Amino acid sequence: MDTDYGTVHTQQSVKGNTLILLIYFISFIVGFPGNCTVIWFTGYRWKKSVTTIWFLNLAIADTLFVIFIPFEITYILMGHYWPFGLFVCRIGSLMFNTGMYASIFFLTFISIDRYCLAFRRDICNKYRYRINIMVMIIISWIISILLSTPYMYFKNTNEKYRNNRDCLEDYHSDNNTYLLRRVVFCISLVMRYLVPSVVMLFCYCLLLFKHSLFLSKGQTYTIVIMITSFMVLWTPYNILYFIDVIGSHYYNADTIIDAAPISISLIFLSSSINPMIYMLVGRYVSFENYSMRESLKLILSEERDNQTNHENEIKMENIN
C-alpha cells in the first residue's frame, strides 16, 4: 500500500474513482479557502496569543495537505498517469507527510493545552508563554520534516509495472530498504496515530466528564466533533497502514487496493474539517447572535478563554 498523495491505483473501479474525486473536490474547495481564512485572521488580523498561535500553525499544516490536491485530481482524470515529473512527485510527498505530522502534533498540543487550562493552572502560569509555545512549534515542524524525509527520498516516478507513469514509493530494491520501510511505517503509526489518539482521548474525555460544568455548549460540541472527526477519518487509513506493516500474507491484496485510496482521500478531507468545525459551531451553536467573523474570533482567540475562565470562577463561587 502506498501512503502518499500520488498513490491511487488503476485497479480502482469507476465508482471508486468517482467517490475519491468527489472527496478531493470537497477537500480542496472547502479546505483551501477555509484554512487560508484561519491563517489570515490568526496570523495578521488578530492579536497574537497562545491560542491563536496554535490554530495558525494547525491551519498552515492543513494547508500543506490540500495544496497538492489539484495534482492528484489531474493524475486520476488522466487515467492514473503522473505528468508532473520526479521533482513535483518528491516535493508533494514531503509537503503531504510534513503537513500530516504537523497537523496531528498541533491537534495533540491543543488538547494538552485545553487540559492544562482546565486542570493544571499551575503549569499554565509557569510555562504557558508565547516564547515557550514558539519553541515547541519550531521543534514540531523540524521533527515533522525529518520524519517525512524518508518518504521523499524513496519516492520515484515508476513505469516498470505498465506503460504508464506513477508517483510511487520504491522500497523494493533490496532487503535493507524494505526493512527500513517497515521501521519508518512503525514509527509513523506510533507518532501520528497511536500516541496522539491516546493523548486526545484522555484530555478531551476528562474535559467532558469532569469539567463539563465549566464548558460552554459551543466548546462541548467542538470537543465532541473534533474527537469524532479525527477517529472516523484517520482510523481506516491507519488500520490499513498497520496491515501493510505486518506483511502482505496477512491480508487480501485486492481488498487493500480498493480501500487504500479511499482511506487516503479521507485524510485529505480531514484537512478541511477543522475550520468548518470552528465556523459552524461558533455560528449555530454557541454564538448565534454574532457574525461569522466574530464567532470565529471568539473560538480561536484568547478572548473566549478569558471569558470562560471568568464564568468558571463565578460557577465555582456558586458551588462553594
UniProtKB/Swiss-Prot annotation:
The keyword Cell membrane does not apply. It is a multi-pass membrane protein. Glycans are attached at N175. Disulfide bonds join C89-C167. GO terms for molecular function: complement receptor activity; G protein-coupled receptor activity. It is found in: Host cell membrane. GO terms for cellular component: host cell plasma membrane; plasma membrane. Residues 1-18, 74-91, 155-188, 244-260 are extracellular. Belongs to the G-protein coupled receptor 1 family. This is G-protein coupled receptor homolog FPV021. It comes from Fowlpox virus (strain NVSL).
